[in-house]
């Protein structure tokens, strides 16, 4: 595939993707790993996370993965810095009672030290 064909393919993919946040479900089943990873991110989180724990998701995207964990909303917080995702989080996370705060893009968290039991 030459450069122009590759760019055309990317543009065609972009037109059908309709990505919001970090939801890449439109590529499910289209990419496979040759070797499975020796660990599973979700499994590690679920092994240690209990309902009473305070959870912070840094750079949550649109909050899709965070919401999929099913953690009690009152014990859940998230940050995001990318403006389109900040707007999405305000629309989806705040109404649920999740403590969402935009990040500053410099790595400074808008929460007091020691506020969380788990940070992902």
For the regions a language model picked out, list residue spans one by one.
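N-terminal, positively charged/glycine-rich alpha-helical extensions of SAM-dependent methyltransferases
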Residues: 1-26
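S-adenosyl-L-methionine-dependent methyltransferase catalytic core, i.e., the SAM/SAH-binding region
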Residues: 7, 100, 118-120
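Conserved alpha-helix/loop element of class I SAM-dependent methyltransferases that forms part
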Residues: 24, 32-54, 64-68
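Residue-level preference for short coil/turn positions at secondary-structure junctions
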Residues: 51, 72, 112-114
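Class I SAM-dependent methyltransferase SAM/SAH-binding core
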Residues: 54-57, 61-108
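A short acidic, Gly/Pro-enriched loop at the edge of an enzyme's catalytic core
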Residues: 106-118
